[in-house]
Amino acid sequence: MNLIMGYTYLIPILFASYLIGSIPFSWILVKVFYKRDLRSVGSGNIGATNAFRVNRGISFLVLLLDIFKSVLVILILEKMCAHKSIMYLTGFTVVLGHIFPVWFLFKGGKGIAPTIGVVLSINIKIFFLFIITWAVVFMIFRYSSLSSIISIISSCIYCAVTENFNSSIFYIAMSIIVLIKHRDNVIRMINGTEKKLF
């Protein structure tokens, strides 16, 4: 286990995780099935929520695929008997790839789906907290962005309380970046110009 997860092996694993995270499933599917560039649709964001504005079925498939990016990487690490903190670090790298894909000059999605994949794979309690919080907030306000923001904050607090420092620090860092990516949504909500999903 120590040999496999040594620094010599960790660097290429993190690099591969970044590349997997950077696969733009939303852009690919919308381009293939609808001949449209998702960057010119709605918010211009390359993510499941913006894909929803093209087709609901496509957005659901995008969501599953983006979640699966993190799940795949972490399941492989689990088979390699990696420490939980390494799983969080690698999941963090997948999320970074999703948010900052090299293929689109580091302008990607907002990281919610791969973050869900991380907690689904590592801590099922955080996953359920995230999903339930998102659903409740969305039913009340109908803003996907607000639901995501509150879910990230609540799951981040729970992770900080229940996980050890080495594990929680990576999830907290990941959460901060995801929240920063939602800053424009926060401004639009304050100004009353944020669009409800439906």
Swiss-Prot record:
Keywords: Cell inner membrane, Cell membrane, Lipid biosynthesis, Lipid metabolism, Membrane, Phospholipid biosynthesis, Phospholipid metabolism, Transferase, Transmembrane, Transmembrane helix
Keyword set includes Cell cycle: no
GO MF annotations, alphabetized: acyl-phosphate glycerol-3-phosphate acyltransferase activity
EC number: 2.3.1.275
Primary location group: membrane
Catalytic activity field: an acyl phosphate + sn-glycerol 3-phosphate = a 1-acyl-sn-glycero-3-phosphate + phosphate
GO biological process terms, semicolon-separated: phospholipid biosynthetic process
Catalytic class of the enzyme: transferase
Pfam families: G3P_acyltransf
Any one cellular-component term (Gene Ontology): plasma membrane
Pathways per UniProt: Lipid metabolism; phospholipid metabolism
HAMAP family for this protein: PlsY
Subunit architecture: Probably interacts with PlsX.
PANTHER family: GLYCEROL-3-PHOSPHATE ACYLTRANSFERASE-RELATED, INNER MEMBRANE PROTEIN YGIH
Classification via NCBIfam families: glycerol-3-phosphate 1-O-acyltransferase PlsY (TIGR00023)
Function, in words: Catalyzes the transfer of an acyl group from acyl-phosphate (acyl-PO(4)) to glycerol-3-phosphate (G3P) to form lysophosphatidic acid (LPA). This enzyme utilizes acyl-phosphate as fatty acyl donor, but not acyl-CoA or acyl-ACP.
The protein, known as: Glycerol-3-phosphate acyltransferase
Species assigned in the record: Anaplasma marginale (strain St. Maries)
Lineage of source species: Bacteria, Pseudomonadati, Pseudomonadota, Alphaproteobacteria, Rickettsiales
